[in-house]
């Protein structure tokens, strides 16, 4: 259902931006009544003749998006000095050197952040017991190994504290990563990372924690995971050290089911239970260590790259984005619209031949590609459908304007500006 809604919205937006709906019988010989958005391609190429119609369509579109029946009438403009002072106080924009108001594009930044978050994967990997005592093994999933840019990586460990009195309230917990022979090239780098030469280990995270209550503790390991991914590796092996835990009776829950029973006695005997001993195995399993990884593909990853929509330059006749800017000053709307100075009323036009319509990056969705596959092969009921040039990516727009009561309104409007076009 969301997909159908999106397709309908994009088609409607494109139609509103470009031209008003034709009256019956007004369609020219090149019109495509079975594909409303395809009518964009039939616009007159003589821009001066078609511009008034375009501008009127843009006006109607803006008023509709602002939920206004008509433009506000500004009878007594607010003095410019008072306006600029209010904008500064409200932090809704800034005044440029030329005196024009520049609205802060918070919504644009949020949209970029949301797009980035959509491209980020979050993976949780539970620890397995390593080959040696007090070591943990984290195997990063196949999906994680396909990602190459680490946004955040953390190891979560549970510190269990008995109710008995303790002589120490703070303990230091260290995460040490075993290095392969020859794994560290530069001596200075190794020294900075805390290389333990006798064990060939690197200190990758350290934290002083409160030993008065049982709780989870988080250890950042982003740089270590990034190095592993850069080296093409998909697993992390760490040794957990807590030299002061035995003084407080505190213990770190380190083990999964593997090797738990054979090590818990030894761990408790030697250092106060650092091996994660506990009477209730199910409860201890709920405190099993895990690695939380947030990562994404790099910009130049082959699966990340996609074909950008074409810009209309007069040399192509296939589906492309046509730039069209309407200045609010030129249309007499700068008396009530404070910012921005105009509207990028971009629209889509061009043909969608069969070899383009189903191409990755040019089609609106996977659904469109499947439909085109059947359409090209003449399968009913898709044989008579036509592929249309429509917006495939839109971005929001922020507006600062006066209402009829001389109030200053800031409104963020979603899906207002066409960024890319493709074949539906």
Swiss-Prot record:
Xref: InterPro entries: Cystine-knot_cytokine, Inhibin_betaA, TGF-b_C, TGF-b_propeptide, TGF-beta-rel, TGFb_CS
Compartments in which it is found: Secreted
Propeptide residue span(s): 21-308
A single GO molecular function term of this UniProt record: peptide hormone binding
Signal peptide extent: 1-20
Gene3D superfamilies linked: 2.60.120.970, Cystine-knot cytokines (2.10.90.10)
Protein name, per record: Inhibin beta A chain
Similarity field: Belongs to the TGF-beta family.
Oligomeric and partner information: Dimeric, linked by one or more disulfide bonds. Inhibin A is a dimer of alpha/INHA and beta-A/INHBA. Activin A is a homodimer of beta-A/INHBA. Activin AB is a dimer of beta-A/INHBA and beta-B/INHBB. Interacts with FST and FSTL3; these interactions prevent activin A interaction to its type II receptor. Activin A interacts with ACVR2A. Activin A interacts with BMPR2. Inhibin A interacts with ACVR1; this interaction creates a non-signaling complex (NSC) that inhibits ACVR1-mediated BMP signaling. Inhibin A interacts with ACVR2A.
Cystine pairings recorded for this chain: 312-320, 319-389, 348-421, 352-423
Keywords of this entry: Cleavage on pair of basic residues, Disulfide bond, Glycoprotein, Growth factor, Hormone, Secreted, Signal
PANTHER family reported in the protein's UniProt record: INHIBIN BETA A CHAIN, TGF-BETA FAMILY
Glycosylated sites: 165
PROSITE patterns: TGF_BETA_1 (PS00250), TGF_BETA_2 (PS51362)
Alphabetical GO biological process terms: activin receptor signaling pathway; androgen metabolic process; androst-4-ene-3,17-dione biosynthetic process; endodermal cell differentiation; extrinsic apoptotic signaling pathway; eyelid development in camera-type eye; hair follicle development; hematopoietic progenitor cell differentiation
Compositional bias ranges of the Basic and acidic residues kind: 261-273
Cellular component GO terms held in the UniProt record: activin A complex; enzyme activator complex; extracellular region; extracellular space; inhibin A complex; perinuclear region of cytoplasm
Top-level taxon: Eukaryota
Chain spans, region Disordered: 257-288
């Amino acid at each position: 259902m969301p997909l159908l809604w999106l397709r309908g919205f994009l088609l409607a937006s494109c139609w509103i931006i470009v031209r008003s709906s034709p009256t019956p019988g007004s369609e020219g010989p090149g019109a495509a009544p079975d594909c409303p958005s395809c009518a964009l391609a039939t616009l007159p190429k003589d821009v001066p003749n078609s511009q008034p119609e375009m501008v009127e369509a843009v006006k109607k579109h803006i008023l509709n998006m602002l939920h206004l029946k008509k433009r506000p009438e500004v009878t007594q403009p607010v003095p410019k000095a008072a306006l600029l002072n209010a904008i500064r106080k409200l932090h809704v924009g800034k005044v440029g050197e030329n005196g024009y108001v520049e609205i802060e594009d918070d919504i644009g930044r949020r949209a970029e952040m949301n797009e980035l978050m959509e491209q980020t994967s979050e993976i949780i990997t539970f620890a397995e017991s390593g080959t040696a005592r007090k070591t943990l093994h984290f195997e990063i999933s196949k999906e994680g190994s396909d990602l190459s840019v680490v946004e955040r990586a953390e190891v979560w460990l549970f510190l269990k504290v008995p109710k008995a009195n303790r002589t120490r309230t703070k303990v230091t917990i260290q995460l040490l990563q075993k290095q392969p022979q020859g794994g560290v090239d530069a001596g200075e780098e190794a020294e900075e990372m805390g290389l333990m030469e006798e064990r060939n280990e690197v200190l990758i995270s350290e934290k002083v924690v409160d030993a008065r209550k049982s709780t989870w503790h988080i250890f950042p390991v982003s740089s270590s995971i990034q190095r592993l991914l850069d080296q093409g590796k998909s697993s992390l092996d760490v040794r957990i050290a807590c030299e002061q835990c035995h003084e407080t009776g505190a213990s770190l829950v380190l083990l999964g089911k593997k090797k738990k029973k054979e090590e818990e006695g030894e761990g408790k005997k030697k250092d106060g239970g650092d091996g994660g001993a506990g009477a209730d195995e199910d409860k201890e399993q709920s405190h099993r260590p895990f690695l939380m990884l947030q990562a994404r593909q790099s910009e130049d990853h082959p699966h990340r790259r996609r074909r950008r929509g074409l810009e209309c330059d007069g040399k192509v006749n296939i589906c492309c984005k046509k730039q069209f800017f309407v200045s609010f000053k030129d249309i007499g709307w700068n008396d009530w619209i404070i910012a921005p100075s105009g509207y990028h009323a971009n629209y889509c036009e061009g043909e969608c031949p069969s070899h383009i319509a189903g191409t990755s990056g040019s089609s609106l969705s996977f659904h469109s590609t499947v439909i085109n596959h059947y359409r090209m092969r003449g399968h009913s009921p898709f044989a008579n459908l036509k592929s249309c040039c429509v917006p495939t990516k839109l971005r929001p727009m922020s507006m600062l304007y006066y209402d009829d009561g001389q109030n200053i309104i800031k409104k963020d409007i979603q899906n207002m500006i066409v960024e890319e076009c493709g074949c539906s």
